[in-house]
Amino acid sequence: RDGVINKDNGYVFQKEKFVWRKNIFKYIKKYNDNNYFVIIITNQSGIGRGFYKESDVKKLHKWMVNKIRSKGANIDKIYYAAYFKDSKIYKYRSKRSLRKPSIGMIQEAKKDFNIKMNQSILIGDSEIDKQTAINAKIKFRILNFKSKLI
């Protein structure tokens, strides 16, 4: 999410601090129109670190999905990993397999949507995203707003 859908300003959990990436609605719509599921997988260690609550992220994600829909595009689902190894809350330090570059969120999406991995693309902006795609054995595309869509 951060760096792809919105500018990565560090631990974004409020819509007031959320800055959309230029042309992102058009990019999402292009994938919708080409029959891809558009699923966001995002590390949100700020929850595990105690910087904000899970409810804050859920509220922001609901707002994001509604805004994207209002622009004629669609997000099928958002998965997030709240994992932080030193979290004071056990559930946030016990699900490391969900945090990218592990593929737990991808495996959940595969199961939930019956996704064919050989027809999937992970679009990201970081080495962690690239490694996640490698680990999941799916194609990776670095986000480049100057390149052609798809």
Identify the role of each PLM range.
Residues G10-V19, Y52-S55, Y92-R96:
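Short glycine-enriched, charge-decorated loop/helix-capping segments at active-site entrances
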Residues I24, I28-M64, A73-F84:
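Substrate-recognition element of Asp-dependent hydrolases with the DxDx(T/V) motif
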Residues D2-D8, I39, Y79-K91:
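Short, basic/glycine-rich phosphate-binding loops at helix/coil junctions
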Residues R1-I39:
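Active-site neighborhood of HAD-like aspartate-dependent phosphohydrolases
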Residues R1, T42, G124-D125:
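Active-site flanking residues adjacent to catalytic metal/cofactor-binding acidic residues
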Residues I5-N6, G46-R49, K85-S87, D129-K130:
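Short, active-site-adjacent cap segments at secondary-structure transitions
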Residues D2, Q44-S45, S102:
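Anionic group-transfer/hydrolysis microenvironments
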